[in-house]
Amino acid sequence: MRYRALVALLLAMCVGFLTACSEEPISLLSDETYTYDQIRNTGLANSCPQLPETARGSFDLDSETGYILTDLCLEPTSYFVKEESTNKREEAKFIGAKALTRYTSSLDQVTGDLTLDSNGVLTFEEQYGIDFQAITVQLPGGEQVPMLFTIKKLVATTAEGQTGISTSTDLTGDYIVPSYRGASFLDPKARGQATGYDNAVALPAAADDEEIMRENVKETPVLDGNISLQVSKVKSETGEIAGIFEAIQASDTDLGSKEPVDVKIRGLFYGRVEPKA
């Protein structure tokens, strides 16, 4: 009887495995609609729409017409943290990291102005949208690095001589990285920038000590980031574009108590160009 139960269990597991493998993966093509049941519990809600591999077109833009880049979505796929080498003769290099924040990492519904000047320079200026996500990544040694992935106030431009958007269009620019935590956040000792204690209650006499001053004086610094958007797919009929991006930005400073480190984020992006209403 025991062997029969074990065999039945193994058969059930094999059937379940084969059934799961036989299902075709869902591809989030931009021109298809999906039901709630297709998306639920799959993690696809964090994925950006995609364009087919055959989308290799281009479209022209008029320098006298205003445009917007809307529904911009950026989906991170890999992370790297810059670490100093133990050998002083070697330069710091980026180390691959694993994301601990699994299903809430993409930026979405971002909109901004898109203009083409008389010199053929295409400029995108981010205005609003879901333009930040709190993400934590883990290095191979176990160290965790929190950061605020964002493109707030991004101003990205192309080289001169552009007449529109094609699969060779590259947009590069800088943006700001707000503090991971706000001024009203309290640390475990109830210290904050805008509220809470000025110093640790257990050490009032040592509040001005240089070693703990940085922990007591909270700051919410605004740091910098840089991103490159490389268009690789264009659907000229609908104005849709897609491609890859690479961003390098600062990590969290724990309200000013730690030095930020550079984090490199790579991934996919999607957007749609429309004339301004």
Where are the language model's segments positioned?
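Beta-strand elements of well-folded, non-transmembrane domains
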Residues: G141, K153-V155, K233-K235, F245-S251, ...
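Bacterial signal peptide processing site
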Residues: S22-E24
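Bacterial N-terminal signal peptides that target proteins for export
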Residues: M1-L9
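C-terminal motif of bacterial Sec signal peptides marking the signal peptidase cleavage site
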Residues: F17-A20
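Acidic, glycine-rich flexible loop segments
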Residues: G182-K258
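An ectodomain-focused feature that recognizes extracytoplasmic/extracellular
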Residues: I26-D209
